[in-house]
């Protein structure tokens, strides 16, 4: 249940969020991030497939992780899909070369679990949901326009 120093965000996706009271807060569905600073602030979970309510968790609430659950301490902030759609994110964002041609999309990223700083992005040339698709590393120094 230890927290690694660095983590791929995809390692958190589809994990159930459990609080210190033992309540299941649903699956992690997306990151909460600050793209200009290349930093993850936390994540968003969906407590119920039937309700539109979503819960936002700060990165410093992370207390443990195993193969199926993420353990948190404290209370989440509650929001809805319409509000969260306005949150900026780079997940699934298109990547273009200097000539303006699309070369892929951001499929994942590696971040430091204590600071939230993103070390690099993983770019997929095709649909990242298809198993076995190739991914290549995009370092922050290669990004011209944030």
Residue ranges and their predicted role:
Residues 1-146:
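Peripheral interaction segments used for macromolecular assembly
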């Amino acid at each position: 249940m230890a927290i690694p120093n660095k983590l791929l965000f995809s390692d958190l996706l589809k994990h159930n969020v459990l609080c210190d009271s033992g309540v299941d807060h649903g699956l992690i569905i997306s990151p909460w991030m600050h793209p200009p600073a290349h930093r993850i602030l936390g994540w968003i979970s969906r407590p119920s497939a039937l309700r539109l309510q979503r819960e936002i968790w700060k990165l410093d609430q992370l207390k443990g992780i195993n193969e199926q659950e993420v353990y948190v301490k404290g209370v989440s902030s509650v929001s809805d899909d319409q509000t969260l759609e306005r949150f900026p994110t780079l997940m699934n964002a298109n990547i273009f070369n200097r000539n303006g041609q699309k070369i892929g999309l951001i499929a994942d990223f590696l971040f430091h679990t204590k600071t939230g700083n993103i070390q690099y992005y993983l770019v997929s040339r095709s649909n990242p949901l298809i198993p076995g698709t190739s991914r290549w590393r995009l370092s922050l120094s290669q990004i011209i326009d944030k």
